[in-house]
Amino acid sequence: MKALRYYGARDVRYEAMDDPAPQSVAEAVVKVEACSICGSDLHIYHGHGFSEDVGFCVGHKAVGEVIEIGSGVQRLKVGDKVMLPGAVGCGRCRSCLAGVVNLCEFGLSSCYGLSSKLQGSQAEAVRVPAADMNAVKVPDGVSMEQALLMTDALATAWFGVREADVQPGSSVAVIGLGPIGLMAVDSAWVMGAHVVYAIDPVPERRALAEQAGACG
């Protein structure tokens, strides 16, 4: 398959690499239909990565179609449309079941595309560990483009606003209006905010937030 592979600062190449395959009965392979770029990918591109590895595939935001499953996968079947959250856990330990995947007790805690430990999703296909946990079916009526936002950016924004305990009638200030900040504005409205203040030095970003009803 073809993939984007990292070889050093400002050296990312679109080239061939081995097709992924399940490495255990609990894994799946997903054909990538859409992926996107994160600020973390840009850090890696500029040489501020999380590993000394080179030659690995980057990217951790993707949606696609299940094309292969291990015999132990129960919740998915070939042909399912799925979204792949960037963070990966075992799906069985207390931490994963509590939603704190970063504290996975079996050491599976990782993220696609940060090293060769788990190849990224800016490729034609990607291996999904613990697929019952780490691949989420796309609901009917949701486009793949919409689902892609849920793999990282919108989920991050929603989590942040929820942790801020925004209640109906709240006044909310969102500082920083990049993609996640803009989605935090939308999330605050959904949670019932009375007013949302949008703070950013970039006029174009403030204008986008104002289009969503925020006070710039």
Model features per residue range: what roles?
Residues V12, I37, G91, M133, ...:
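Short alpha-helical
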